[in-house]
C-alpha cells in the first residue's frame, strides 16, 4: 500500500518492541532493505541521514511521528496495526478489520544480491555513512552461527542491542532461522544490569550478547552471579583476559569472542574463550564460512606470523559499499591482484585494524591505524565529532581524542582553540560559559555517545617536531565541581562521596553538581546505581540516576524510596 518495491530502502523510527521486530520482517518480506534510525539522536542528524539515503518511506508510530516534522519524506504509521501489551503498543490500540485488508498480497522474489539492510556508522569526513549489506552476505553469517553453535528451537535468544548496531541483526533474525523464541527487551533495559539479570532469569534466556565493557558492568551486578546460559557472545571491543576469567568465576556459560566491522555483515571471525582458554591477549580467532582474513604490509603483501600488518577482509560477507558514496567505497573496498601467479583479483575491505598471525593460525588484534575508536561498543570516527565542533562560530581549531581515565575507562575530550583577537593567553583557557556553549552545540548535532565528556579550551594545540599536531601532548581535563552548596545531610554526603570515587574527582561535588556533566556516562552510571543500592538498602534503578543526576536530587530520591519502604513495612 505504501508503494514499496524490491531494492527500495525503508527507514524505521521505532522504539524496541515486538512492533519494531515485526516491522523489520515486513520490510524484508516486501523485498526492501531496512534502515534503522536512532530515535534518541538529534533531529538534525536524522534529517542528514534521510537526505542522504532517500528512503521510499519511514515507518513510525505514535511516539516517533513528530521526528519527521518538516522532513520531505513519506511515512507509514504502524500505531494501529499491532495490538500489543508492550511499550511498542498497547491493548487499546485499534487494529484494522481483517476484512479491510487484501486477502492475498503477492510477495516479490528477493535476489541474494539485493540489499537487506543499511546501517549508518560514524564518518571521518563529518557525515555518517550508510553501509549496504546484501541478503547473500548476512545469510552466510546467520547460517554459519546456527550450524557452528548448534542453535535450534530449544534455545531462547535475547534482543537487546539497539537496532542501529549490526549485532542486532543476528539477534533479530537468527531465532527465526532456528525456530527459536525471541525475547525482546524493553527500551533502555540494555543499560540496566539489574533489570537485565532479572529478565534473563525470568524468561529463561540462554543466548545473549554483551559488549565487553557492558559485560564487566553486568558482572558487577550481584543478581548476575550463578546465571546459567548456553552461550554469551562478546564483540564490539577487545575482550580482556581478566574479564574472561572473571566471567567464568561468576557464571555458568560458554563465552565466545567475535570480531567484525559493519562492512562485513556483523562478524567475520570467532574464538572460543572458554574456561580452559589461557590466551592473553584473547585473539579474534579464525574466519567464519566463505570468508578470508588477510594481514598485509604497506605494499599489500602478506606478512609472516608474528609480524603486525593491516587486516583486510574478503569473501561472501563483504558489504556492497557505502550508499551514494562511490568515492569512499572505492577507497575502502579495493581490488587486490591476488597472492599468486594463478590467483585472480579479489575484492578486499581495508578494516583499518592492525593484526598479526599467531603460530596456531588465529588472528590477534593489535589496535587501529586511524583516529577511529570503539567507545562502549560503538564505532566512533573522531573526525565527525571534530566536524560538529567546527561549525560553532567560536571554534577556530579542534581536536578530539579518547582518553583513559583513572578508572581505566575511556572518555571523549574535545580540545578547542577559540576565535580570539585578544592578547596571547595561557595555554589552557578558563571560560566555562564558552565550553558549555560548545557542548550544547555538539548535542544538537551528535548522538549522546559521541558528545565529549569535557571541553578543554587552549590558546594553541601542541605541535611535534615534524610540524604535526601532537595528540599525546594534549593535557588531561580537570572535571571541576561547582560545590556552590556542599553536601550536608548524611544521604547527600553518601551520594557525593560515591560521585567522587566513581568519577575520580579531586574533591567532593556539591548538591547542584550533575553526574554526567562531571564526566559520567552510562556504564559509570550503572556502577553508581549499584554502589548506592548497596549503601542505602533501596532498589535504586539506573533510570533514577538519569532522571535525578544531581547530588541533591538523587539523595532526595533515595530518601523518598527509604520512606516508601518504611511505610510499606
Predicted regions and their residues:
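Phosphate-binding active sites in nucleotide-utilizing proteins
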Residues: 6, 33, 519
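Gly/Thr-rich phosphate-binding loop signature of adenosyl cofactor/nucleotide-binding cores
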Residues: 10
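Active-site/ligand-binding surface loops and adjacent short beta/alpha elements
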Residues: 14
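Phosphopantetheine-attachment site and its flanking helix in carrier
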Residues: 17-28, 380-384, 396, 469, ...
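Motif- and composition-driven signal specific to adenylation
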Residues: 19-25, 32-51, 55, 61, ...
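AMP-dependent adenylate-forming
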Residues: 42-43, 57-108, 138, 253-257, ...
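Short acidic/glycine-enriched loop/turn segments that link adjacent beta-strands
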Residues: 166, 263, 406-410, 548
Amino acid at each position: 500500500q505504501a508503494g514499496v518495491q524490491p531494492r527500495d530502502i525503508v527507514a524505521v523510527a521505532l522504539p524496541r518492541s515486538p512492533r519494531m521486530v515485526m516491522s523489520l520482517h515486513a520490510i524484508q518480506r516486501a523485498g526492501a532493505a531496512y534502515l534503522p534510525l536512532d530515535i534518541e539522536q538529534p533531529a538534525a542528524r536524522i534529517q542528514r541521514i534521510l537526505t542522504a539515503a532517500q528512503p521510499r518511506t519511514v515507518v513510525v508510530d505514535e511516539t516517533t511521528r513528530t521526528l519527521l516534522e518538516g522532513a520531505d519524506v513519506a511515512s507509514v504509521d504502524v500505531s494501529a496495526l499491532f495490538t500489543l501489551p508492550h511499550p511498542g503498543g498497547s491493548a487499546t490500540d485499534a487494529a484494522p478489520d481483517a476484512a479491510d485488508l487484501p486477502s492475498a498480497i503477492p510477495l516479490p522474489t528477493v535476489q541474494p544480491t539485493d540489499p537487506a539492510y543499511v546501517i549508518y556508522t560514524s564518518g571521518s569526513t563529518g557525515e555518517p555513512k550508510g553501509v549496504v549489506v546484501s541478503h547473500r552476505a548476512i545469510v552466510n553469517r546467520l547460517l554459519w552461527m546456527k550450524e557452528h553453535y548448534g542453535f535450534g528451537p530449544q534455545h531462547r535468544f535475547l534482543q537487546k542491542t539497539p537496532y542501529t548496531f549490526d549485532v542486532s541483526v543476528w539477534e533479530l533474525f537468527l531465532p527465526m532461522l532456528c525456530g527459536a523464541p525471541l525475547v525482546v527487551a524493553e527500551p533502555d533495559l540494555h543499560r540496566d544490569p539489574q533489570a537485565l539479570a532479572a529478565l534473563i532469569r525470568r524468561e529463561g534466556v540462554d543466548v545473549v550478547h554483551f559488549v565487553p565493557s557492558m559485560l564487566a558492568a553486568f558482572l558487577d551486578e550481584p543478581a548476575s552471579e550463578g546465571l546459567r546460559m548456553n552461550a554469551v557472545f562478546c564483540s564490539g571491543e577487545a575482550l580482556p583476559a581478566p574479564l574472561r576469567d572473571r566471567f567464568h568465576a561468576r557464571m555458568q556459560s560458554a563465552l565466545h569472542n567475535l570480531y567484525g566491522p559493519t562492512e562485513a555483515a556483523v562478524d567475520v571471525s570467532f574464538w572460543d574463550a572458554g574456561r580452559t582458554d589461557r590466551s592473553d591477549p584473547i585473539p579474534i580467532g579464525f574466519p567464519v564460512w566463505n570468508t578470508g582474513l588477510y594481514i598485509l604490509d604497506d605494499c599489500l603483501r602478506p606478512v609472516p606470523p608474528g609480524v603486525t600488518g593491516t587486516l583486510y577482509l574478503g569473501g561472501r560477507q563483504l558489504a556492497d559499499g557505502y550508499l551514494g558514496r562511490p568515492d569512499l567505497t572505492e577507497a575502502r573496498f579495493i581490488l587486490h591482484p591476488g597472492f599468486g601467479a594463478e590467483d585472480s583479483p579479489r575484492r578486499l575491505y581495508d578494516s583499518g585494524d592492525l593484526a598479526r598471525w599467531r603460530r596456531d593460525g588465529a588472528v590477534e588484534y593489535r589496535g587501529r591505524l586511524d583516529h577511529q575508536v570503539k567507545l562502549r561498543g560503538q564505532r566512533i570516527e573522531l573526525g565527525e565529532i571534530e566536524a560538529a565542533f567546527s561549525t560553532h562560530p567560536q571554534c577556530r581549531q579542534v581536536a578530539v581524542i579518547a582518553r583513559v581515565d583513572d578508572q581505566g575507562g575511556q572518555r571523549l575530550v574535545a580540545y578547542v582553540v577559540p576565535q580570539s583577537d585578544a592578547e596571547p593567553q595561557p595555554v589552557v583557557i578558563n571560560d566555562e560559559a564558552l565550553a558549555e556553549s560548545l557542548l550544547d552545540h555538539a548535542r544538537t548535532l551528535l548522538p549522546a555517545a559521541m558528545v565529549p565528556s569535557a571541553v578543554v579550551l587552549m590558546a594553541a594545540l601542541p605541535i611535534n617536531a615534524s610540524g604535526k599536531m601532537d595528540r599525546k601532548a594534549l593535557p588531561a581535563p580537570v572535571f571541576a565541581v561547582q560545590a556552590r552548596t556542599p553536601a550536608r545531610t548524611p544521604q547527600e554526603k553518601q551520594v557525593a562521596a560515591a560521585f567522587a570515587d566513581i568519577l575520580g574527582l579531586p574533591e567532593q561535588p556539591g548538591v547542584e553538581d550533575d553526574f554526567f556533566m562531571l564526566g559520567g556516562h552510562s556504564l559509570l552510571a550503572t556502577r553508581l546505581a549499584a554502589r548506592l543500592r548497596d549503601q542505602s538498602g533501596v532498589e535504586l534503578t539506573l533510570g533514577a540516576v538519569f532522571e535525578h543526576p544531581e547530588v541533591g536530587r538523587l539523595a532526595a530520591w533515595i530518601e523518598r524510596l527509604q520512606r516508601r519502604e518504611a511505610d510499606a513495612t
